[in-house]
C-alpha cells in the first residue's frame, strides 16, 4: 500500500473522530470505497454573500499525496465567486498552488471556507468571474443595507 493511500486513510479517520470540520459546519469523506476521490461540504461563512448556503466540493488525489497536491479540487455547487470557475467549479487559491506536504484535507476545506469569506480579487479565475462576483457581492451588500434599515424601525412600540 502506498504512503499516499495510508495518509488519506489516516486523515479520514482523523476527520471522523476529531470533528475538526464542525467549526465550519462541514465534512469530507471518500466517495464509496475510492480513497483517492473525496466529496465534502461546508456551510457558507456567516455575514457573507454565501451565508446559509451549503457548498459541496470534490477532491481527487494521486498515490503521491501528500507530497503532491490533489490533482483536482473543485466546487460542485454553482457559485458566483471571483476565484471559482462558473462552469467547471475549478478553484484558484494559494493553498494548492503553494502546496506543502504538511497540508491536508481539513486544510483544503478551511481554505475554501476562508476563500468564501475573503475572496481574492487580485487573483481572479478570469475577468468574467470577477465582474459577476462583484455584481453578486454588491447586490448582497444592498440587501443587507435594506434589511438593516427596515429592521431599524422595529423599536418594540405597540400602537
Feature locations, PLM:
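Eukaryotic intrinsically disordered and solvent-exposed regulatory patches
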Residues: 24-27, 42-45, 59, 78
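A short beta-strand-loop element at or near the start of a globular domain
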Residues: 36-40
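Domain-scale recognition of soluble eukaryotic interaction modules
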Residues: 2-15, 41, 69-159
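Proline-anchored loop/turn motifs at beta-strand termini and strand-loop-strand connectors
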Residues: 59-70
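N-terminal leader/pro-regions and domain N-caps
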Residues: 1-33
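Conserved, non-catalytic sequence blocks in retroelement Pol enzymes and Pol-derived host proteins
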Residues: 29-32, 46-47, 99-104
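Short, cysteine-centered beta-strand-loop-beta hairpins and adjacent loop/turn segments enriched
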Residues: 45-52, 64
Amino acid at each position: 500500500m502506498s504512503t499516499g493511500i495510508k495518509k488519506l486513510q489516516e486523515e479520514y479517520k482523523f476527520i471522523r473522530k476529531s470533528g475538526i470540520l464542525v467549526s465550519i459546519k462541514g465534512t469530507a469523506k471518500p466517495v464509496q470505497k475510492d480513497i483517492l476521490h473525496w466529496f465534502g461540504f461546508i456551510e457558507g461563512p456567516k455575514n457573507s454573500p454565501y451565508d446559509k448556503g451549503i457548498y459541496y466540493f470534490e477532491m481527487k488525489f494521486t498515490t503521491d499525496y501528500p507530497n503532491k497536491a490533489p490533482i483536482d479540487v473543485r466546487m460542485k455547487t454553482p457559485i458566483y465567486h471571483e476565484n471559482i470557475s462558473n462552469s467547471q467549479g475549478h478553484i484558484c487559491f494559494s493553498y494548492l498552488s503553494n502546496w506543502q506536504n504538511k497540508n491536508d484535507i481539513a486544510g483544503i476545506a478551511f481554505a475554501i471556507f476562508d476563500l468564501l469569506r475573503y475572496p481574492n480579487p487580485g487573483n481572479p479565475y478570469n475577468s468574467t468571474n470577477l465582474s459577476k462576483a462583484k455584481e453578486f457581492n454588491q447586490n448582497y451588500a444592498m440587501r443587507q443595507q435594506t434589511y438593516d434599515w427596515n429592521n431599524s424601525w422595529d423599536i418594540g412600540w405597540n400602537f
